[in-house]
């Protein structure tokens, strides 16, 4: 806070019962920082006055950092569709006694699998 100025009293010689008086000055401290210095003035009327003012400013600064972790899981599904098709052909022949020849027969895969 600021320190108050000191007042000075007037010095009179016109009467013997006039005394010098001194005044103690106080000041109100500023908040938040260092106060200024006070100034005081005195007038010579047998009293002294002084005023002191103090101002202060303060600044608070802060920095912060934050870290975070994010994890996630996921599943994926898929379908596969396919068809396999084919044809197999073959010939079969046989000979039965009696002089009768059997004609070749074409066999497909569907007939062979039965």
From Swiss-Prot:
One BP term from GO: rhythmic process
One Gene Ontology CC term in the entry: perinuclear region of cytoplasm
Biased composition (Gly residues): 30-79
Compositionally biased tracts (Low complexity): 80-91
28 X 2 AA approximate tandem repeats of G-[TN], as annotated region: 30-87
UniProt-annotated location(s): Nucleus; Cytoplasm, Perinuclear region
Keywords from the UniProt entry: Biological rhythms, Cytoplasm, Nucleus, Phosphoprotein, Repeat
Biased composition (Polar residues): 105-114
Region feature (Disordered): 23-114
Sequence repeats: 30-31, 33-34, 36-37, 38-39, 40-41, 42-43, 44-45, 46-47, 48-49, 50-51, 52-53, 54-55, 56-57, 58-59, 60-61, 62-63, 64-65, 66-67, 68-69, 70-71, 72-73, 74-75, 76-77, 78-79, 80-81, 82-83, 84-85, 86-87
Main location: nucleus
PTM remark: Phosphorylated with a circadian rhythmicity, probably by the double-time protein (dbt). Phosphorylation could be implicated in the stability of per monomer and in the formation of heterodimer per-tim.
Complex and partners: Forms a heterodimer with timeless (TIM); the complex then translocates into the nucleus.
Record remark on domains: The run of Gly-Thr is implicated in the maintenance of circadian period at different temperatures. Deletion of the repeat leads to a shortening of the courtship song cycle period, and thus could be important for determining features of species-specific mating behavior.
Function recorded in the entry: Essential for biological clock functions. Determines the period length of circadian and ultradian rhythms; an increase in PER dosage leads to shortened circadian rhythms and a decrease leads to lengthened circadian rhythms. Essential for the circadian rhythmicity of locomotor activity, eclosion behavior, and for the rhythmic component of the male courtship song that originates in the thoracic nervous system. The biological cycle depends on the rhythmic formation and nuclear localization of the TIM-PER complex. Light induces the degradation of TIM, which promotes elimination of PER.
Annotated protein name in UniProt: Period circadian protein
Taxonomic classification: Eukaryota, Metazoa, Ecdysozoa, Arthropoda, Hexapoda
Gene (name only): per
């Amino acid at each position: 806070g600021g320190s108050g100025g000191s007042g000075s009293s007037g010095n009179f010689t016109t009467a013997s019962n006039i005394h010098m008086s001194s005044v103690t000055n106080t000041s109100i401290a500023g908040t938040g920082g260092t106060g200024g210095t006070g100034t005081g003035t005195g007038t010579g009327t047998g009293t002294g006055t002084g005023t002191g003012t103090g101002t202060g400013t303060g600044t608070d600064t802060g920095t912060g950092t934050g870290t975070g972790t994010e994890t996630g899981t996921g599943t994926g599904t898929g379908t596969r569709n396919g068809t396999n098709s084919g044809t197999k052909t073959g010939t079969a022949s046989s000979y039965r006694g009696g002089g009768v020849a059997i004609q070749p027969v074409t066999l497909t895969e569907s007939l062979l699998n039965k």
